[in-house]
């Protein structure tokens, strides 16, 4: 238990210095301890990201969250209050849409991680289902993570924060970023009036709609939560066949074009 407390304190100390320029939950509230059982924290000595447990051996995250010496934390809620349900794993294998990891901000920002050994489900560790259909515009979805809760001057919580946002028409994101392609395998999601958003530290975490992981936190503007500047999420439904093929053992499966 002493070692766990030391680790927890180290995570808290370094988290504020360890974020890539990516995503967080601004404008949210502390997650209920029972609502984020699939939420995973990916971490090394340089930065942290989110992820989602999809079965006993596999975690889904963003390609730009790839890191050396990745450690995978499951069942965590409050970093300052360790509990016996917490698990730690390392990455055994990682899979990307392109072997070169030549993803872009608007396409193929997805990573599938096989852990070094399976986890046992518990009251604080459970998987999230892959999508059976894509979300519709207007759907209310849930975001969560240990990312910054203020922006641009970031502060980071020791517990994950959650918030609701809406699936928006992709044209809203193109209006905010005219350089985006006309079509993309991303979801545009947020609150048009601003105030709620993912932000630094939330990258790789889930966008949950109707109890399924529909999106992966990919990128957004800085400062976060600006009006008319929603976030961008990898559209998981478009990659479901690829994910299932990799898990089934077809490691040469290709992503959709």
Swiss-Prot record:
Single GO cellular component term: secretory granule
Domain Peptidase S1 per the UniProt entry, residue ranges: 25-248
Enzyme nomenclature, EC number: 3.4.21.-
Locations listed in the record: Secreted
Residue span(s) of the pro-peptide: 19-24
Gene Ontology terms for molecular function: serine-type endopeptidase activity; toxin activity
Glycan attachment points: 44, 78, 102, 153, 169, 250
Superkingdom assignment: Eukaryota
Its biological purpose: Snake venom serine protease that has fibrinogenolytic activities by hydrolyzing the beta chain of fibrinogen (FGB). Typical arginine esterase which hydrolyzes esters and amides of arginine.
Family: Belongs to the peptidase S1 family. Snake venom subfamily.
Full protein name: Beta-fibrinogenase
Species whose genome carries this gene: Macrovipera lebetinus
Organism lineage string: Eukaryota, Metazoa, Chordata, Craniata, Vertebrata
